[in-house]
Design a protein with these regions (language model features):
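Ribonuclease/tRNase effector modules and their secretory precursors
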Residues: 1-102
Length: 102
């Protein structure tokens, strides 16, 4: 499926079953995870550990109401951001805070 939150020329997609599994395990839907990409201070980093067949990345950014920092795993294909996983993880928050000092 394709979804969009207004990211320039990019749109989002994900596997619906993976989305449900992610929400059950981590309490975050992929729809919610899109908002991390709208954070002007977001941090994008390569996910070298999981980039065997295609490049994968992390996006560390604020959630919709700025109450937490999301870590979103994704890949990029033909102007589409395919979300693979998302959640609130301490390591992602630490990377975000180191890149955006107060």
């Amino acid at each position: 499926m394709r979804y969009t939150v207004g990211m320039d020329d990019s749109s989002f997609e994900w596997d619906d079953e993976k989305n449900l599994e992610n929400e059950r395990k981590h309490g975050v839907t992929f729809y919610e995870a899109q908002h991390a990409f709208l954070d002007k201070n977001r941090v994008i980093a390569e996910d070298a550990a999981h980039s065997e067949h295609e490049s994968r990345y992390f996006c560390f950014g604020s959630n919709k109401d700025s109450s937490g920092i999301l870590t979103v795993r994704f890949t990029y294909r033909l102007n589409r951001i395919r979300i693979i996983g998302a959640g609130y993880w301490r390591k992602g928050k630490k990377i975000y805070e180191q890149s955006n000092p107060i």
